């Protein structure tokens, strides 16, 4: 397994471009299964999860065409099997997103129960109950979700989400696009990635209204056609590099991003002492060489502070002036990185769903192990602000969510390199 070696102590300084959002790209790729003519998806990040989704299509008989810019053209009319097998689904939770489109377009689907990050119990029952509300017959047996649409196809329905679910909202929105009649999703996720999927569906000929609010109304249509669509920028990658710059007292300019979908994070960085300026597609952060001030953070669904940025802020707080509390309300079991950071000299106390971080002037490099995607990003930031060398093991977690992380950090002046396992 590859490892990252980071020699800390350098302030980040420079410009990089932000990749397309994985959490937008995966549902949009799944949505291409709904169309009866080819769909081209652009601005895809070069990530393992994207490769896995493309491989999953290949297993199903759909052979995407990939150009030199990694734009992917999908023609789902060649589909041969409606099974998403366990050996692929187990590596990536987002495979569940093919369930709604396959069921709506082809009338049946068989999808293995998903794997993915080891954070908390992320149930798929909302997906199942929502599709049942649209008339689907679903059984879970042998580790597979086996779904059949009624004769004549899925029917529009009303569904209320007991808890806000991003992938649940996306799956039902895609299924409803080809259902008969109107579907109303209440307590729907409001994330920018949900809005991006709705925009893509509408570009394909769907009628989706209200995405970005907690009530989404979908009028089913008879068919969806081809489109060319650009995936939105990755707000979590953007936030991660901003926090890395803030923690090191540096200055960065991030291009091809969108400041309007990151307001909660930018506000907290300003509170930490960062000078931030923005344009329509760029963000600049300058700490002017200063140490950050500790901030309090409480995660919640969008538009509040994102759970996927919590670990990075713990790293910044670890070397900040003062004490900051980070409260995690979205997932349980999401402080696994804290114990690794304490081995580097951080002073972090976990009490239930709260991490209390007392800043220290410097962390010390140490061998550490990544446990999930965002936790691994926090260890990279910790390595950047530590004295000496930090060796991060199990970086396949990082590669699931960050495109060329060591190359981008090198462009910003970090001493970081990948060593083959």
UniProtKB/Swiss-Prot annotation:
Keyword Cell cycle: yes
Gene Ontology MF: a single term: UDP-N-acetylglucosamine 1-carboxyvinyltransferase activity
Catalytic activity as recorded in UniProt: phosphoenolpyruvate + UDP-N-acetyl-alpha-D-glucosamine = UDP-N-acetyl-3-O-(1-carboxyvinyl)-alpha-D-glucosamine + phosphate
Binding residue positions for phosphoenolpyruvate: 22-23
Residues where UDP-N-acetyl-alpha-D-glucosamine binds: 93, 122-126, 165-167, 308, 330
Principal EC category: transferase
Physiological role: Cell wall formation. Adds enolpyruvyl to UDP-N-acetylglucosamine.
Annotated protein name in UniProt: UDP-N-acetylglucosamine 1-carboxyvinyltransferase
Organism listed in the record: Pseudomonas aeruginosa (strain ATCC 15692 / DSM 22644 / CIP 104116 / JCM 14847 / LMG 12228 / 1C / PRS 101 / PAO1)
Lineage of the organism: Bacteria, Pseudomonadati, Pseudomonadota, Gammaproteobacteria, Pseudomonadales
